[in-house]
């Protein structure tokens, strides 16, 4: 999965898919009442990126739905996965559950079209703080209460704060998520700073273990050719990047073209990939 980073305006969906992304990451900001309000990263953000692009969340979700609905004039068949980077630091731990419920209701209305021929992309809820695991509980409960529990088949989970893996596993379990139940594990840091792959390798080992909790591992945010090669050699499933074309180029190199390929819609993002 080539994951286009910081896609916060609708026009950027086409921009990143044109560069080779089959997945995007979008930043979600909340108001004081725990309601998702707009897509926005803000400063600081990655080097060589403009941090201030934004869209009202309802508008963005409608644009995203069109980009991922077969038959729509804006449809991009390549776009199969969306990571919502949920800026829950604005929420209190006690408000996280409410935030999750409200976000599920918003996705149901504006992205899934009330469960009637909505967008087809898989969704990952990416939360920076393990203390906010109740966001996941609220999200899941809202879909169950609205009789759309079937949509949870399209939803996965990630904690992005580079916490200890055992602590993340515990937080997921508290949220009602079983081991290897649609779990993506991220590791990374802004592209302005170098980071070693020690924790990535630990996560990959967990993913490949019979008693691990992880389905997929992704690394963020990189675009240097050497960093991309190192990440692929560490056997990650996804790479988040500002330059999807760099990942495409590396995948076409002799060392990688027979080991990796781009994921398609037929590839289940919740299944462990075995060579």
UniProtKB/Swiss-Prot annotation:
Keyword Acetylation listed? The answer is no
What is known about the tissue distribution of this protein? Answer: Expressed by the venom gland.
Biological process terms from the Gene Ontology for this record are: killing of cells of another organism; lipid catabolic process
Record keyword rRNA-binding present = no
Q: What class of enzyme is it?
A: lyase
Q: Which InterPro entries match?
A: PLC-like_Pdiesterase_TIM-brl
Cysteines paired by S-S bonds: 45-51, 47-192
Keyword annotations from UniProtKB, A to Z: Cytolysis, Dermonecrotic toxin, Disulfide bond, Hemolysis, Lipid degradation, Lipid metabolism, Lyase, Magnesium, Metal-binding, Secreted, Toxin
Q: Give the stretches traversing the membrane.
A: none
Tell me which domain of life the UniProt entry assigns to the organism this sequence originates from: Eukaryota
E.C. no = 4.6.1.-
Which cofactors does this protein require?
Answer: Mg(2+)
Q: Which GO terms describe its cellular component?
A: extracellular region
- Primary location recorded for the protein, binned into one broad class: secreted
MF terms (GO), sorted A to Z: lyase activity; metal ion binding; phosphoric diester hydrolase activity; toxin activity
Give binding positions for Mg(2+): 25, 27, 85
Can you state which reaction this protein catalyses?
A: an N-(acyl)-sphingosylphosphocholine = an N-(acyl)-sphingosyl-1,3-cyclic phosphate + choline; an N-(acyl)-sphingosylphosphoethanolamine = an N-(acyl)-sphingosyl-1,3-cyclic phosphate + ethanolamine; a 1-acyl-sn-glycero-3-phosphocholine = a 1-acyl-sn-glycero-2,3-cyclic phosphate + choline; a 1-acyl-sn-glycero-3-phosphoethanolamine = a 1-acyl-sn-glycero-2,3-cyclic phosphate + ethanolamine
Q: What's the record's note on cofactor binding?
A: Binds 1 Mg(2+) ion per subunit.
What residues make up the catalytic site? 5, 41 (nucleophile)
| Compartments reported by the entry | Secreted
- What protein family is recorded? Belongs to the arthropod phospholipase D family. Class II subfamily.
Job of this protein:
Dermonecrotic toxins cleave the phosphodiester linkage between the phosphate and headgroup of certain phospholipids (sphingolipid and lysolipid substrates), forming an alcohol (often choline) and a cyclic phosphate. This toxin acts on sphingomyelin (SM). It may also act on ceramide phosphoethanolamine (CPE), lysophosphatidylcholine (LPC) and lysophosphatidylethanolamine (LPE), but not on lysophosphatidylserine (LPS), and lysophosphatidylglycerol (LPG). It acts by transphosphatidylation, releasing exclusively cyclic phosphate products as second products.
What protein name applies here? Dermonecrotic toxin LruSicTox-alphaIV1
Please report the organism this UniProt entry assigns to the protein.
Loxosceles rufescens
